[in-house]
């Protein structure tokens, strides 16, 4: 099995775990990033959310203050190349959602501890957003992304639940 096939199997395993969680099933609005090749492919998750009648919110980076504005997308046509080449919602075609309007946030990361602490992709965008987000958070993790400890500070907030693929 080549690396790409293995990654697709892991992604599919994590995707299936996610859509079976109580948090997913109870959520009306899902927040998650548009994948850019460094994290798990999120388009199938977004498509599944739409298929189930859920709303989807994806972040637009606001460089000043390293903030994120999650905006509802109803189609991939509402997405454009944004900050650092990452796909982001077009603000002219989408509406901003407040953190409390998002029922479940799927948080990306490179490395995780079993307690949910993470190293992201730099910039602290998600750490700042998590500080004002009170609803459930989940990360999709391959066992190779787990480590026993990471340096943390007072700004680091753990993800509430890790879905871990054993593949």
Feature names for model-found ranges:
Residues 11-19:
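Short, amphipathic alpha-helical "lid/cap" segments that border enzyme active or binding sites
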Residues 1-10:
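Single conserved hydrophobic/aromatic residue that forms the stacking wall/gate
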Residues 110:
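Active-site/ligand-binding-proximal alpha/beta "capping" segment
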Residues 26, 52-53, 131-136:
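Short glycine/proline-enriched coil/turn segments at helix->beta-strand junctions
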Residues 21-24:
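Glycine-rich helix-loop-beta junction characteristic of Rossmann-like nucleotide cofactor-binding loops
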Residues 3-4, 100-105, 113-117, 127-167:
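Surface-exposed, charge/polar-rich loops and edge strands
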Residues 29-96, 141-149, 159:
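Extended, well-folded interaction surfaces typified by the phenylalanyl-tRNA synthetase beta subunit core
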């Amino acid at each position: 099995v080549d690396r790409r096939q293995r990654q697709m199997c892991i992604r599919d395993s994590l995707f299936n775990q996610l859509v079976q969680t109580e948090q997913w099933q109870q959520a009306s609005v899902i927040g998650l990033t548009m994948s850019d090749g460094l994290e798990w492919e999120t388009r199938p998750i977004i498509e599944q959310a739409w298929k189930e009648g859920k709303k989807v919110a994806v972040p637009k980076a606001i460089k000043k203050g390293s903030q994120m504005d999650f905006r509802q997308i109803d189609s991939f046509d509402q997405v454009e190349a944004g900050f650092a080449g990452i796909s982001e919602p077009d603000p002219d075609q989408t509406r901003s959602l407040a953190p409390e309007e998002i029922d479940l946030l799927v948080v990306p990361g490179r490395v995780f501890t079993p307690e949910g602490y993470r190293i992201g992709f730099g910039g602290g965008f998600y750490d700042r957003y998590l500080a004002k987000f009170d609803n459930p958070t989940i990360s999709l993790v391959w066992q190779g992304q787990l480590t026993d400890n990471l340096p943390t500070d007072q700004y680091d907030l753990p993800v509430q639940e890790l879905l871990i693929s054993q593949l």
